[in-house]
Amino acid sequence: LTCLICPEKYCNKVHTCRNGENQCFKRFNERKLLGKRYTRGCAATCPEAKPREIVECCTTDRCNK
């Protein structure tokens, strides 16, 4: 599985996940409309969202756009 890993909205940096990491995730704060920063990467399980945070998980290559 390969996941995107950069914080910008439009991301092209790809990372190959390790064994056991079978999900890509994207995490961001729902309140910041301008200058939104994303946390992207690989995970074994979908990370839990903190208050006012959105976490999206998926299981195909580069799906965490």
Curated annotation (Swiss-Prot):
**Entry keyword Signal:** no
What's its job?
Binds with low affinity to muscular (alpha-1-beta-1-delta-epsilon/CHRNA1-CHRNB1-CHRND-CHRNE) and very low affinity to neuronal (alpha-7/CHRNA7) nicotinic acetylcholine receptor (nAChR).
Chief location of this protein? secreted
**Species classification:** Eukaryota, Metazoa, Chordata, Craniata, Vertebrata
| PROSITE patterns from the UniProt entry | SNAKE_TOXIN
Write down the Pfam families for this protein, in alphabetical order: Toxin_cobra-type
Keyword field: Disulfide bond, Secreted, Toxin
| Annotated Gene Ontology cellular component terms | extracellular region
Tissue specificity as recorded in UniProt: Expressed by the venom gland.
* Designated name of the protein: Weak toxin CM-11
Q: Which InterPro entries match?
A: Snake_3FTx (IPR003571), Snake_toxin-like_sf (IPR045860), Snake_toxin_con_site (IPR018354), Toxin_cobra-type (IPR054131)
Kindly list the cysteine pairs connected by disulfide bridges.
3-24, 6-11, 17-42, 46-57, 58-63
Entry's family note: Belongs to the three-finger toxin family. Ancestral subfamily. Orphan group II sub-subfamily.
